[in-house]
Curated annotation (Swiss-Prot):
Gene Ontology biological-process entries: translation
Native source species: Wolbachia sp. subsp. Brugia malayi (strain TRS)
Role description: Binds as a heterodimer with protein bS6 to the central domain of the 16S rRNA, where it helps stabilize the platform of the 30S subunit.
Subunit field text: Part of the 30S ribosomal subunit. Forms a tight heterodimer with protein bS6.
One GO cellular component, as annotated: cytosolic small ribosomal subunit
Keyword Lyase applies: no
Sorted UniProt keywords: Ribonucleoprotein, Ribosomal protein, RNA-binding, rRNA-binding
InterPro entries in UniProt: Ribosomal_bS18, Ribosomal_bS18_CS, Ribosomal_bS18_sf
Gene: rpsR
Protein name, UniProt field: Small ribosomal subunit protein bS18
GO molecular function list: small ribosomal subunit rRNA binding; structural constituent of ribosome
Lineage: Bacteria, Pseudomonadati, Pseudomonadota, Alphaproteobacteria, Rickettsiales
């Protein structure tokens, strides 16, 4: 995010608000070979759903696009077979 700061001679200078280095995200499912994305693995699927039962987006979980599609399909299958609830908290 850039912010414009007024200089003494009324010209604007672009200043970057971010400090430090941006951490590179590594897919948590690609590093662990033990955990396979399967609709029967409810412990794994529950880590990628919110408290209300919604599927968390990639920007929050850090999962790559390929694994996110597999996760989505596995969660939908598990919901259909009643292994994972559609919603967990009462709204």
């Amino acid at each position: 995010m850039t912010k414009k700061r007024n200089n003494f001679n009324d010209s604007y200078v672009s200043v970057n608000n971010r400090t430090g280095f941006k951490r590179s995200k590594v897919c948590p499912l690609a590093t662990s070979q033990d955990e396979d994305i399967d609709y029967k693995n409810t412990d794994l699927l529950s880590r990628f759903t919110s408290d209300y039962g919604r599927i968390l987006p990639r920007r929050l979980t850090g999962v790559c696009a390929k694994k996110q599609r597999k996760l989505r399909l596995a969660i939908i299958r598990a919901r259909f077979l009643a292994l994972v609830p559609y919603c967990t908290k009462k709204v």
